[in-house]
């Protein structure tokens, strides 16, 4: 079941296929299909090298750190846009947890912030103990909260554990209950679905505030 959620879904679908490290023939095929690539104001959160490394890594810790980096960029984007700053956090190091609090003070929806915190707690666990385990209970908690987020397109994003919900990530086809799916693949799958819902929420929230927002290259 291919993701369908208007233009946002199309962008997401292409991005998780590793667009950004394409051959000239693949780029031409995209152009012929009228497909655009994620960029603009959210380029930092969809950095080609980071996303490509995330889709291809077999290392759980590496995946967690890259997801954390991308989520931090989403927080930066929120704070930059709502304050009309090019770099809101240009005054020195601010930890991820404090960035969440600042973003919430600046209007970031609470339902998004809760999921940011859950991903951050996993990252922090690894930061203090590289032998730490991510439990299925932790992942299910994130999954349920992602599924509860609103959809902003004409066709809703399926529930993460919908048996028909499959999506390509790198050279794999992932589904929540896929045969032999690893913890690393599950957390990557959750992140990509969450990033799609973040993007949809940002489009809606910035439009409501009359803030210009460009998410294509």
Predicted regions and their residues:
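Amphipathic alpha-helical interface elements
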Residues: 2-121, 125-217
